[in-house]
Amino acid sequence: MTIMRXKHPLLKLINHSLIDLPAPSNISSWWNFGSLLGICLMIQILTGLFLAMHYTSDTTTAFSSVAHICRDVNYGWLIRYLHANGASMFFICLFIHVGRGIYYGSYTLLETWNIGIILLFTTMATAFVGYVLPWGQMSFWGATVITNLLSAIPYIGNTLVEWIWGGFSVDKATLTRFFAFHFILPFIITALVLVHLLFLHETGSNNPSGLNSNSDKIPFHPYYTIKDLLGILLLLMVLMILVLFFPDILGDPDNYTPANPLNTPAHIKPEWYFLFAYAILRSIPNKLGGVLALILSILILAAFPLLNSSKQHSLIYRPITQSLYWIFIANLLVLTWIGGQPVEYPFTTIGQISSVLYFTIIIVLMPMAGMIENKILKLY
């Protein structure tokens, strides 16, 4: 069997990626989230496939078809809630995965990092078009508000919006194409994941110390397969608690009302995992400025390798940058909270302060802290 897995073209590929892969001996549980994201993606594709068998992408029947899935299809409620809450688990793992990358300096692996940013954008696009499909109030108005942002693009904005809508408002054509996008994007994500792994295995994994670990590697199997398995079991446990006890805790009650173009909900807001970006968007009074800030809030991740001023790889021995990092995380949570609040004082002011702080920490304070730490440690 050993010879077989080392010689067979297909098994050789799996062997070099998951079995005989040399891995650093000291990677912590923060490195588990990559495999957890893979499991989340598999759960989403499988549950999504079964949902697509019963869903109809027509404005008159979309809402009813989701109700039909929950009421009449065998374990349809379970599949639907696994898919909805699976998306939340996906984003929790994504944010932790990116946060780990920032903390331990994984952004120095340029190709892997940049493919990761593209993956983040693609996943966000998938989640957005997916949220429109149940055709509830928040689905409809969320789609209307977010697609309308493209009208801020000078000269071609309005034409672009109508082209995406397939008409003069969010309607049947929009729903049908969003369903098509939602179906195809996870497979594009899967392809990108393989590219992400390809680039990662070119350089090898980073590790908590930030030092070169080539002299101290261990095989991925059995050490990290068993470790990943524990992570997967914990993830599934949390997901099942969510699905079976609190299936609607992360959703919006407005989405249980069928879409009505004549009745606007009091507070239009996206799913919780977009709230931080939504808060940044709302904190700028100008439409185009808001859209640019929204895109930059994610695209700023690409600037991390450029803004890195420290001679050390990881934040583990950098107390000043470490403090800034945790302030940044706290600020991100504040933005998430603000995104779900109505547009009124004091929320708007808090949102504006947090948005400025979000960009200031990344662009100004962290590079400065890196330079100060270099000076203190005499690392010129």
Swiss-Prot record:
Cofactor: heme b
Localization terms from the record: Mitochondrion inner membrane
Cofactor notes: Binds 2 heme b groups non-covalently.
GO cellular component, one term: mitochondrial inner membrane
GO molecular function: metal ion binding; ubiquinol-cytochrome-c reductase activity
An example Gene Ontology biological process: mitochondrial electron transport, ubiquinol to cytochrome c
Residues that bind a ubiquinone: 201
Binding locations of heme b b566: 97, 196
UniProt: heme b b562 binding residues: 83, 182
CDD domains registered for this protein in UniProt: cytochrome_b_C, Cytochrome_b_N
Domain of life: Eukaryota
Primary localization: mitochondrion
UniProtKB keywords: Electron transport, Heme, Iron, Membrane, Metal-binding, Mitochondrion, Mitochondrion inner membrane, Respiratory chain, Transmembrane, Transmembrane helix, Transport, Ubiquinone
Listed transmembrane segments: 33-53, 77-98, 113-133, 178-198, 226-246, 288-308, 320-340, 347-367
Membrane topology per record: Multi-pass membrane protein
Note: Heme 1 (or BL or b562) is low-potential and absorbs at about 562 nm, and heme 2 (or BH or b566) is high-potential and absorbs at about 566 nm.
Subunit field text: The cytochrome bc1 complex contains 11 subunits: 3 respiratory subunits (MT-CYB, CYC1 and UQCRFS1), 2 core proteins (UQCRC1 and UQCRC2) and 6 low-molecular weight proteins (UQCRH/QCR6, UQCRB/QCR7, UQCRQ/QCR8, UQCR10/QCR9, UQCR11/QCR10 and a cleavage product of UQCRFS1). This cytochrome bc1 complex then forms a dimer.
Similarity comment: family membership: Belongs to the cytochrome b family.
Function according to Swiss-Prot or TrEMBL: Component of the ubiquinol-cytochrome c reductase complex (complex III or cytochrome b-c1 complex) that is part of the mitochondrial respiratory chain. The b-c1 complex mediates electron transfer from ubiquinol to cytochrome c. Contributes to the generation of a proton gradient across the mitochondrial membrane that is then used for ATP synthesis.
Designated name of the protein: Cytochrome b
Organism from which the protein derives: Thomasomys gracilis (Slender oldfield mouse)
Lineage: Eukaryota, Metazoa, Chordata, Craniata, Vertebrata
